[in-house]
C-alpha cells in the first residue's frame, strides 16, 4: 500500500529534523571571542533543537569552581593532552590563554555516524585547522555588539584576573577580524534573538538540496 502525500511529507521532515540511520549528521562550528557568550548560546540552541549535540572539548586547564568534568569540558592533565596530540586523537587542537583545548576526532565521528548533527564550540585557530583538513562543515562566528560590551561582560563574570581580562581583550581584537572566514555571522546583542538566529542557520543547512537529496528523490518516486 502506498503512503499518502501527507505521510511522505512527514517522512521528509523527519529526515531533516531528527537523527537516524538514513542520514549522516552535519558538523557545525561556532567561534567567538572569550566573553561573547558562545557557550551559553549553543547550550540553549541544543536544548531547543532535536537531533543536535554539542561536542565537549578536552582541555588541560584546571576546572573552575562549579565546572563538572565531562559536562563543561573533559579535563585532563597537560601530559595526557599532549599524548593525545601525539597519538593523532584530535580533530583539532589549539593553545589558548596558556592552556590546550581540543576536539576528539573519534567522539565527533561517532555522533555524526549515528545521525546526530554536532556543534563544535572552538577557537578561530581550531576552526582553521578543521577547514584545512578538508572537513565539510558550516561555520558561524558570534560577535559581541561592541568592544565595550565585550569588556563589560568579561569583567561582569568575575572569572579572571585583571591581567587575564586584558589578555583576552587583546586576543579578541585579532579574533573578530577573522569573521570573514566564516559562513555566517550572529551578533549576540540579546540571547533569545541570537539563539533564534543560530537555530535558523541549523534549519536552513538541514534543508539544503544536497542534504535532502535522498528524501526528495523518494518523494519524486511517488509521482511515477
Question: Can you name each region flagged by the protein language model?
Answer:
Residues 41-42:
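Post-Walker A alpha-helix
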Residues 31-33:
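P-loop (Walker A) phosphate-binding loop of NTP-binding proteins
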Residues 2-4, 200-224:
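C-terminal accessory "lid"/substrate-recognition subdomains
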Residues 57-120, 124-128:
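ATP-dependent small-molecule kinase phosphotransfer cores
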Residues 1-27:
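Extreme N-terminal, non-catalytic leader segments
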Residues 46-55:
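Post-Walker A helix-loop "phosphate-sensing" segment adjacent to the P-loop in P-loop NTPases
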Residues 61-66, 89, 112-117, 124, ...:
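A glycine- and Lys/Arg-enriched "phosphate-lid" helix/loop adjacent to the NTP-binding pocket
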Residues 38:
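Conserved lysine of the Walker
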